[in-house]
């Protein structure tokens, strides 16, 4: 039952999919944290895997960069493969001065400069929010592990190289915690097709201060976030 962008067989994906942007990061998650791993799709080298974590079946697949790519894969996973829970895991740039590099942000809502949710909502503004049950599961997992998290709005940008740095002042004033490129689209797709979605990201760099994590710090923080998210996923 291959789709135009996924060549997995029926039943290849678990109900819960971790959804990093980078397909090689998906491979890393599968090989590092899952057992009994099987690669289930590789169209356009957008790799997807299914395995088990602490006995529960879990999948992980790359989404690509940006809302259009993420929305394509999310739609096909939900509509054609019966995926119920999509959890974006990745990195972001911090906006707020009280957010630090290596912090973990849970995107309770996603602002955006994209028009995609207006298109699906007949020209009106749609509140792109995370699913409460998924968000609560990750928050509880963070409490158990003692992981410091921030919960609030992220901004899903269409442009990586923004021509309007003054927009950062507006974002900070409005309490936006970090900038990434997918969550608003993912949340819109999930709402449209009756699935559940969440965005969990680590702060790899600070847009206002210029501070950045080293590659070693980035990997350690990312690993901690993945374990926290997987421990939440097995409770769903």
From Swiss-Prot:
What's the name of the protein? Answer: Purine nucleoside phosphorylase DeoD-type 2
Cited PANTHER family: PURINE NUCLEOSIDE PHOSPHORYLASE DEOD-TYPE, URIDINE PHOSPHORYLASE
In this UniProt entry, which cysteines form S-S bonds?
Answer: none
What is the stated purpose of this protein? Catalyzes the reversible phosphorolytic breakdown of the N-glycosidic bond in the beta-(deoxy)ribonucleoside molecules, with the formation of the corresponding free purine bases and pentose-1-phosphate.
The UniProt keywords, alphabetically, are:
Glycosyltransferase, Transferase
Fetch the Pfam families from UniProt: PNP_UDP_1 (PF01048)
Write out the similarity annotation. Belongs to the PNP/UDP phosphorylase family.
Its Enzyme Commission number(s) read 2.4.2.1
Q: Which residues form the active site?
A: 205
| Gene Ontology molecular functions | purine-nucleoside phosphorylase activity
Sequence positions that bind a purine D-ribonucleoside: 5, 180-182, 204-205
Per the record, the domain of life is Bacteria
């Amino acid at each position: 039952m291959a789709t135009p962008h996924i060549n997995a067989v029926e039943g290849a994906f678990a109900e819960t999919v971790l959804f990093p942007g980078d397909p090689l990061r998906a491979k890393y998650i599968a090989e590092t944290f899952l057992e009994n791993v099987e690669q289930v799709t590789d169209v356009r080298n957008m790799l997807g895997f299914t395995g088990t974590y602490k006995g529960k079946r879990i999948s992980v697949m790359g989404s690509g960069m940006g809302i259009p790519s993420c929305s394509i894969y999310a739609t096909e996973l939900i509509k054609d493969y019966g995926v119920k829970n999509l959890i974006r895991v990745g990195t972001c740039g911090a906006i707020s001065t009280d957010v630090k590099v290596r912090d973990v942000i849970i995107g309770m809502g996603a602002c955006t400069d994209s028009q995609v949710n207006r298109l699906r909502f007949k020209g009106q503004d749609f509140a792109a929010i995370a699913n409460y049950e998924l968000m609560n599961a990750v928050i509880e997992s963070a409490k158990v592990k003692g992981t410091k998290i921030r919960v609030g709005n992220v901004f899903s940008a269409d442009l990586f190289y923004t021509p309007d740095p003054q927009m950062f002042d507006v974002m900070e004033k409005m309490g936006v915690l970090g900038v990434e490129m997918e969550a608003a689209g993912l949340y819109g797709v999930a709402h449209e097709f009756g699935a559940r979605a969440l965005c969990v990201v680590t702060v790899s760099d600070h847009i206002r201060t210029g501070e950045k994590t080293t590659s070693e710090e980035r990997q350690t923080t990312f690993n901690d976030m993945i374990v926290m998210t997987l421990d939440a996923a097995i409770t769903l």
